[in-house]
């Protein structure tokens, strides 16, 4: 699990989006960003999570929060995910797991007694100066957007 904590500077990264355009975290300096890591596009939990963000994106935007979803999927799979689910925010491909390792969300997991390596579903709210404001983990996919919006609503706007 991540060793990052609120107050730490968010690790810098450059990743391709679903149409192979390079996106840098530094492109968002001056804006708040929700960087959320998810295991695999088009799977049930990840689809629920992404569609709930899609359906509530205006609420995130009203809090001046941009959304970036990151997974180990290739750009073609991300494009399919975006098109099939009509996603209205940016998905990034971390095929080599370099960024997920920088954020400390890639590691050994156990499912039904089998060990494997994968993404720990984790979200980082990064402030407009590039520092981690809040880390969200151990949540149900269907509640992800509610937890983050509740947190955003509890803060004074900046």
Curated annotation (Swiss-Prot):
Residue ranges of every copy of the Thioredoxin domain listed in the record: 4-157
GO molecular function, one term: thioredoxin peroxidase activity
Key words, A-Z: Antioxidant, Disulfide bond, Oxidoreductase, Peroxidase, Redox-active center
Catalytic reactions of this protein: a hydroperoxide + [thioredoxin]-dithiol = an alcohol + [thioredoxin]-disulfide + H2O
Active site per UniProt: 46
Gene3D superfamilies linked: Glutaredoxin
Cellular component annotations (GO), alphabetically ordered: cytoplasm
Domain of life: Bacteria
Intrachain disulfide bonds: 46-51
An example Gene Ontology biological process: cellular response to oxidative stress
Top-level enzyme category: oxidoreductase
EC number: 1.11.1.24
Subunit description: Monomer.
Family, per entry: Belongs to the peroxiredoxin family. BCP/PrxQ subfamily.
Functional summary from the UniProt entry: Thiol-specific peroxidase that catalyzes the reduction of hydrogen peroxide and organic hydroperoxides to water and alcohols, respectively. Plays a role in cell protection against oxidative stress by detoxifying peroxides and as sensor of hydrogen peroxide-mediated signaling events.
Miscellaneous section: The active site is a conserved redox-active cysteine residue, the peroxidatic cysteine (C(P)), which makes the nucleophilic attack on the peroxide substrate. The peroxide oxidizes the C(P)-SH to cysteine sulfenic acid (C(P)-SOH), which then reacts with another cysteine residue, the resolving cysteine (C(R)), to form a disulfide bridge. The disulfide is subsequently reduced by an appropriate electron donor to complete the catalytic cycle. In this atypical 2-Cys peroxiredoxin, C(R) is present in the same subunit to form an intramolecular disulfide.
NCBIfam families from the UniProt entry: PRK09437.1
Record's protein name: Putative peroxiredoxin bcp
Gene: bcp
